[in-house]
Amino acid sequence: MSSSAGKDKEPKVSSGTKEREKEAKAVGPVKESKDKDLKSKVKDAKEGKRDPVGAQAGVAFSLDNTIKRANPASGMRKKASNAEVIKELSKCREENSTRLDLAKKSIHMLPVSIKDLTQITELYLYGNKLQSLPAEVGNLVNLVKLALSENSLTSLPDSLDNLKKLCMLDLRHNKLREIPPVVYRLSSLTTLFLRFNRITAVEKDLKMLPKLTMLSIRENKIKHLPAEIGELCNLITLDVAHNQLEHLPKEIGNCTQITNLDLQHNELLDLPDTIGNLSSLSRLGLRYNRLSAVPRSLSKCSELDELNLENNNISTLPEGLLSSLVKVNSLTLARNCFQSYPVGGPSQFSSIYSLNMEHNRINKIPFGIFSRAKVLSKLNMKDNQLTSLPLDFGTWTSMVELNLATNQLTKIPEDVSGLVSIEVLILSNNLLKKLPHGIGNLRKLRELDLEENKLESLPNEIAYLKDLQKLVLTNNQLTTLPRGIGHLTNLTHLGLGENLLTHLPEEIGTLENLEELYLNDNPNLHSLPFELALCSKLSIMSIENCPLSHLPPQIVAGGPSFIIQFLKMQGPYRAMV
């Protein structure tokens, strides 16, 4: 069994299985109706004739080699000439329009005649090639919205401080290395977008924008925020994600109207205690920082409905924190340093719908920890150090998705039968030797992943999983399959690669919806049942490294449709050809 060595490292994929599946999927479906020579090739194979191409056994490829030529680019907007832009300006003036849309016209320079359009309140210039704005834009004193995103602006003219009514300024995706000084003088601004520039600092003059409700400066290179941000008392959304912040000023606690605070993907080492003053906060993004703790005062943010602390250095939470956050329904503590569940007892999970504890160092799920978690539907414990499951495991009746992959589980309790709502069960990369008979009670199960365990057989009760669509048994020690597998008529994906199978049961022919079948690397599999020919939807089949001597190389090279046709002609189903 493999395990993650580094913090961001995913568990290894066994023996190239995932790569094989990727290659096989590239083949795509092969339609028998499109291949006029298919029957003759099968006939040649029966007579012992060799394919002149000399294709290797186990190599799948598409028979439909038609090259679809790309259509010439259509619908692209032509570069607007200066005359066309002037024409648009004239039309706007003549019609006395208050809205001018010059977006995506490949404009390099705005005509100075724009100064005459003093009536407009909205000007859209996004998606052009502007490197600067003419000072004459400052004449547009009635502007309320100015959209300049997706240009190449490096500065703004000082004349813009005449725009006393401007409420929304969009400067996303430009080449600004600083917030243009004139921006701080636009005191009527309520919305300011500066995302994806090259800004390194926010100046103290930010306090001159007291009406701001929305400030987005994400995806820049900002290392600190000024204390003056605390004077933005009307701020509702503050997005500073994807920057280089190590600390937040304590004055952030003065912004008590904030409901959405996004700080993810920074270098934050701590949070100020004053964050507890943000009593209206409903969304707090802290994932991918360097936090080793969160302040106890966070418990005052009782409106939080989502808390994501993924990929920090946190090993514990303040006792009672989660119990106080009664509206949190999604909690992500993945990729941290937890060695045990947070202290606080069952009440801390009473409102949780989704809990993600992936990639920590937890070796035990405490008995009764979810006794009050009546709405818990998704639990991700992947990549921890679990060796067993709690005795009350069978009481998790509301669980819909359960991921226990990459642990050290040696068995699944028989009372797994109590998980009557479960639809997705991931148990890959463990040490399981067998499955409990109770698995057959999971009647809603759609996906069951048991890859890379030590299974030697499957219980007959697996036949009761009538809704199962994906069954992954890759890299185990299976020698046979139960005949009841034929009852899984909704199955579309069946992974059996890297086992010790000696044969497939003829009941596999009843899997009428099967689309993907992986049999690769079964060294004892010498033949395929004729009944496989009945799987008419089969489009991906991986059989490399199987000694299937009864299949001629040219048939194997032809892909699933060739193999199915060959099996039909060889067996009792030739009348279907």
From Swiss-Prot:
SUPFAM superfamilies to which the protein is assigned, alphabetical: L domain-like
Protein's UniProt name: Leucine-rich repeat protein SHOC-2
Family designation: Belongs to the SHOC2 family.
LRR repeats: 96-118, 119-140, 142-164, 165-186, 188-209, 211-232, 234-255, 257-278, 280-302, 303-324, 327-348, 351-372, 375-395, 398-419, 421-443, 444-465, 467-489, 490-511, 513-535, 537-558
PROSITE patterns: LRR
Keywords assigned by UniProt, alphabetized: Cytoplasm, Leucine-rich repeat, Nucleus, Repeat
Range of residues in the leader sequence: none
Record lineage: Eukaryota, Metazoa, Chordata, Craniata, Vertebrata
Role summary: Core component of the SHOC2-MRAS-PP1c (SMP) holophosphatase complex that regulates activation of the MAPK pathway. Acts as a scaffolding protein in the SMP complex. The SMP complex specifically dephosphorylates the inhibitory phosphorylation Raf kinases, stimulating their kinase activities. The SMP complex enhances the dephosphorylation activity and substrate specificity of PP1c.
Pfam family, one: LRR_14
Organism per entry: Xenopus laevis (African clawed frog)
Any single GO BP term: positive regulation of Ras protein signal transduction
GO cellular component: cytoplasm; nucleus; protein phosphatase type 1 complex
